[in-house]
Curated annotation (Swiss-Prot):
NCBIfam families: PRK00888.1. It is found in: Cell inner membrane. Keywords: Cell cycle, Cell division, Cell inner membrane, Cell membrane, Coiled coil, Membrane, Transmembrane, Transmembrane helix. This is Cell division protein FtsB. It holds the Pfam family DivIC. Residues 22-110 are periplasmic.
Amino acid sequence: MRLIILCLAALVVLIQFPLWLGKGGWLRVWDLDHQVVAAQKKNDELKARNAKLNSEVQDLKEGTGAVEERARYELGMIKENEVFVQILDPNKKSTFVSIPPPVVEPKEKR
């Protein structure tokens, strides 16, 4: 009787081993589930970034507002007879490069 119980206990352990530690076991499934969740989160972040970039591309293609804004903030350009005022944070290092307006020399009178 004792031998039968030991054999049955050994069989139960052998049957449980692949369930917990095998190729398709619970631990592997749990790990893969966490990998799927992480990949979905990263995909959602990338989709949001792509939507933002797509919106910016459409704005650059269809309107002049975005081009003018980039010219002002990134290149320091302004339109003729326009005054552009930008308030900078004194604690933040500026990456803005100011380009002075061209010097127009008065025409000579003949």
